Amino acid sequence: MRTLMHKITFAGTLGAMLLGGGLARAADALPPVQKMGSVEYLSGGIGVDESKAIEKASPHWPLTLEFAAKDRQRADFMADVKVRVRDAHGHDALDATSNGPFLLAKLPPGSYGIDATAAGKTLHEHVTVKQHQPARAVFVWAGDAST
């Protein structure tokens, strides 16, 4: 009986270690968190592992932005997008360049105007960030804005 209990304990410990390792790998795949003033953000999503890690982390961030270019035949993710987020008073909350098709930001609750610029074309969106309710905005450039 004692041997059985040791096996069960070992199996439980091993399972917890494997699960923890999986979570650590997902966190390792995230790009580094950066900061502008009091706003933390991360951007990226180049590569399958990083893209999946960002999608998994997205619900835990108040704001998710996604960038793509679409023509008649296909849609491509965008990188090197200049992002400017302004609060309801017109003050810059975030001014950054996204390193990939996703940008996650920890903004306080409120209304924000967002300008996203790629290949000289600027798109505008408005979002409302609410407490415990993540907001998402998707920017899609028509044609081949990725060049």
Regions found by a protein language model. Name each.
Residues P108-P109, Q131:
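Surface-exposed loops/turns
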Residues G100-K106:
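Short, surface-exposed beta-strand/beta-hairpin micro-motifs centered on an aromatic residue
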Residues H91-N99:
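Short, acidic Ser/Thr/Gly-rich low-complexity loop/linker segments typical of extracellular
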Residues A11-G20:
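Bacterial N-terminal signal peptides
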Residues R25-V81, A118-T147:
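Primarily secretory-pathway and cell-envelope proteins
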Residues R2-G12:
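Bacterial N-terminal signal peptides that target proteins for export
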Residues K82-D92:
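Short amphipathic beta-strand segments in non-cytosolic proteins
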Residues G110-A116:
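A short tyrosine-centered beta-strand micro-motif
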